[in-house]
Amino acid sequence: MDEFQRNSNXHRXWQQLFLYPLFFREDLYAIAHDHHLDRSGSSEPTEIFFSHFFSFLTVKRSIRRIRKQNKSISLFGNSDSNKLIEYNKNFSFKSMLEGFTIVLEVSIAMTSKHFIKGMDGWNSLRSIHCIFPFMEDKLPHSNYISDIRVPYSIHPEILVRIFRRWIRDVPSLHLLRLILHEWKNSFSQENLEKVLITQRGNTRFSLFLWNSYVYECESFLIPLIKRFFNPQSLLYGSFPDRTHFEKKIKDIVIFPLQKISPKXIWLLKDSFIHYVRYGERSLIALKGTHLQVKKCRYHLFHFWQYYFHLWFQPYRICSLELSKTSFSFLGFFLNVKMRPLVVRAKMLDDLFITDLITNELNPIAPIRSILFSLAKEKFCDISGWPISKLSWTSLSDDDILDRFDRIWINLFHYYSGSINQDGLYHIKYILLLSCAKTLACKHKSTIRVVREQLGSELFTNSFSKEREFISSSFSKTRSQRERIWNSEISQRNPLXXFWQKMENKQIEN
């Protein structure tokens, strides 16, 4: 790859005009085959056996089909009943997509610096918990929030139009169009979301398509919203018609008109906007009027309708007032509530006591939803009573203890910043008893016998890690009200992801 990039930099003008011959180089598909084999072998060991049947002869035949560009013939379809041959062709299709993606990634990275570094003022964070300190700082100063679910059902021709900004090679665009149609037709409408969004269905090609699509959305959408909510400030004296201006400003200014200084008036100076996205979920927090929020929702609908030719379902945009309702994001319930503060100021011999009211973001762990997820995984019943995990009784004692330990550690670290820590320790009690019942069921004994044999070894690792995590995060001088966010968490907790899917289904219905 390094040699390929060096050659591309030396012949950059040639690279922009002639990408098409690079798609037929077998060494790129060899790199893609090794990369795909490493990924599949680590997650699904059963595929290692089938991967030995990979043959570059199948890749050459597929390349010949692409060169013919006959749309009536499926490029990567197969009609063989043999499972080994069927898997071989499917594996060849994935390897070809990997090689195709390598060429596109390198070429687009060279032609667009913003594609790698991002736009000015944007931060791309690897940890999920880095989002919450930002939200704690910004959301209390906002009064509305728009929860947006980015639509994923996009037509292949729209993707081709997106890539036309970076690819100038016409044959490459035709080849890309052919592969995109073939790739989308291989999935049903229900499975397309899993392929693009979920981590299990992600391939290098699907990730590349999703990132390109989201980048295109944000590069056009966010500047438009910023321009809409942050127009140029205008002085009062610049308006020749004072009466006409006062009639207009009643619908724009948030504070009463009587308190405005007659010398200078700033138009929409207090409005600001903040944008956060993780996966397909986007949040737009703003400070403005209800009319502005409705206009923003209107422009979002028309943006996807006219620019991407998508019918944007109404449930995909939910506008909420932060002071009245709560919303869910990344497995948390989030709301903004007022927090009273008493400030004492002493000046000479006088003591002044002032009451201040500030807004505070409260992240809440969905304990009931976590209990429902644990009940579905057979750790407890619907009422929350712990039961034995029968499917794990064939494992060794160390494996059983390690699995329960990892479940609790992941939950504790993920929801360490929530305000309802008592509910988390209730979850811990359920997992502890479920672990003891699983061991008792395996050895055909009682919970008392298991606890006498193991003693303090039940969840020993989790207790030690928990104390270490708390002691390293808190000092004696810090307030106990201060929350802990773990910067090492890079993905959602599985239980939180399951709960978020249930929430999305309820919204759609």
UniProtKB/Swiss-Prot annotation:
One of its GO terms (biological process) is RNA splicing. The keyword Plastid applies. Keywords: Chloroplast, mRNA processing, Plastid, RNA-binding, tRNA processing. It comes from the Eukaryota. GO terms for cellular component: chloroplast. It is found in: Plastid, Chloroplast. Disulfide bonds: none annotated. GO terms for molecular function: RNA binding. Coiled coil: none annotated. Usually encoded in the trnK tRNA gene intron. Probably assists in splicing its own and other chloroplast group II introns. Belongs to the intron maturase 2 family. MatK subfamily. This is Maturase K.
